[in-house]
Design a protein with these regions (language model features):
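Short, small/polar residue-rich loop motifs at catalytic or cofactor-binding pockets
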Residues: 34-35, 139-141
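Short active-site neighborhood of thiol/selenol oxidoreductases, capturing the structured segment around
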Residues: 53-74, 80
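Structural microenvironment flanking redox-active thiols in thiol-disulfide oxidoreductases
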Residues: 69, 74-112, 124-126
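Short acidic-hydrophobic, aromatic-tinged amphipathic segments that line or gate anion-handling sites
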Residues: 117-121
Length: 175
C-alpha cells in the first residue's frame, strides 16, 4: 500500500512539474515588432554591454540557455558555433545569455570555441526585459529571439538545442 501511495505521489509530482514547465514557455513581454530591450549585462570578459546598441542594424539573434556546460546548452551553443560563418554571411550578430557568472561564461566560451559574446545575467535584468521565464530550478528557460533593424521578427519560446542554427536559417530563408 505504501509503495502504491509513493508511486502515485511521484506521478502526481511529475504531472504538476511538467504542466508548470509547459506553461512557463510562453513569453508575456515581447511581441513581433517590438524593439530590442535597452538593457545592460556583463559579457564573458566583464565588459558592460547594452543589447540595444549591440543589435544595431541588420539581424541580431539573442538566445537564452539555462546553464553553461550542460548537454542541451552545449548542443545549442555549438549548433550556432558550427553555423556561425553562414549566419555571419547573412549578417546575423549572435549573443548568448544565461544566469551563469562572468567567469563561467568565459570558460564556456573558451571550452566550446564560441565566436560570439556570452552575457552573464546574474541579476536577471535581461531575462526580465525579454520576459524569459524561470524554470522550476530557478534557471532561465531556453528561448531565442531574432531581430532585424532593432525590431523583433521571430521568437522561439521552446528553442531547440542542436537544431537552433537550422531554425534561425530557416527563418532567414523565408525573408
Amino acid at each position: 500500500m505504501k509503495l502504491k501511495l509513493a508511486f502515485l505521489l511521484c506521478l502526481a509530482g511529475l504531472v504538476v512539474g511538467a504542466w508548470a514547465v509547459s506553461n512557463q514557455q510562453s513569453n508575456g513581454t515581447l511581441k513581433i515588432g517590438d524593439p530590442v530591450p535597452s538593457v545592460m549585462a556583463r559579457d564573458q570578459d566583464g565588459k558592460l554591454v547594452n543589447l540595444a546598441e549591440v543589435a544595431g542594424s541588420g539581424y541580431f539573434l539573442i538566445y537564452f540557455y539555462p546553464k553553461a556546460f550542460t548537454p542541451g546548452c552545449t548542443a545549442q551553443a555549438c549548433s550556432l558555433r558550427d553555423a556561425y560563418e553562414e549566419l555571419q554571411n547573412k549578417g546575423v550578430k549572435i549573443v548568448g545569455v544565461s544566469l551563469d557568472t562572468v567567469d563561467s561564461q568565459k570558460k564556456f566560451q573558451q571550452a566550446q570555441r564560441l565566436p560570439f559574446e556570452l552575457l552573464s545575467d546574474r541579476d536577471k535584468k535581461v531575462t526580465g526585459a525579454f520576459g524569459v521565464p524561470l524554470l522550476l530550478n530557478g534557471l532561465a528557460a531556453r528561448q531565442a529571439y531574432l531581430f532585424k533593424d532593432g525590431k523583433l521578427i521571430w521568437m522561439d519560446t521552446k528553442a531547440s538545442t542542436d537544431k537552433q542554427a537550422q531554425d534561425v536559417l530557416a527563418v532567414l530563408a523565408q525573408r
